[in-house]
């Protein structure tokens, strides 16, 4: 198996502070994040969008594997993961993730596609990691 890493730096307080996110691959290298990008829609990244990107990528790769096992190959798949962060008690929690998949898969019928997409949603490693409500809207186009 593999082990990889991501890292974060932070300077200052919660509202005036500035952070930087990096990944081992270099895909992100000191990319800015902070309170304003997380809660006020300002430029920069935030943990929730990174979790969304990771979940969308993991789910889509898992579905590719599951499709292959069913002798199907996607011509194209596009997945979006909407991650909801809500205030709970004294803190915050990710309360749900909604996956939206649009896929072009020659030879797939909707019933089989829905079954395989559901397996990918339940079985991808990021889904297994997350302790939240995960929903899926999968469409063949």
Which role does the model predict for each range below?
Residues 1-53, 60-141:
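Extended beta-strand/beta-hairpin segments
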């Amino acid at each position: 198996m593999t082990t990889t890493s991501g890292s974060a730096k932070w300077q200052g307080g919660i509202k005036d502070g500035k952070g930087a996110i990096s990944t081992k691959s270099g895909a992100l290298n000191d990319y800015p994040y902070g309170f304003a990008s997380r809660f006020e829609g300002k430029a920069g990244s935030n943990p929730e969008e990174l979790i969304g990107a990771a979940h969308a990528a993991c789910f889509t790769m898992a579905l590719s594997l599951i499709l292959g096992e069913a002798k199907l190959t996607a011509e194209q798949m596009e997945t979006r993961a909407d991650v909801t962060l809500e205030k709970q008690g004294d803190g915050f929690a990710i309360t749900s993730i909604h996956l939206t998949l649009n896929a072009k898969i020659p030879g797939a019928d909707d019933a089989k596609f829905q079954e395989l997409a559901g397996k990918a949603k339940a079985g991808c490693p990021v889904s297994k990691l997350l302790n939240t409500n995960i929903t899926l809207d999968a469409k063949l186009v």
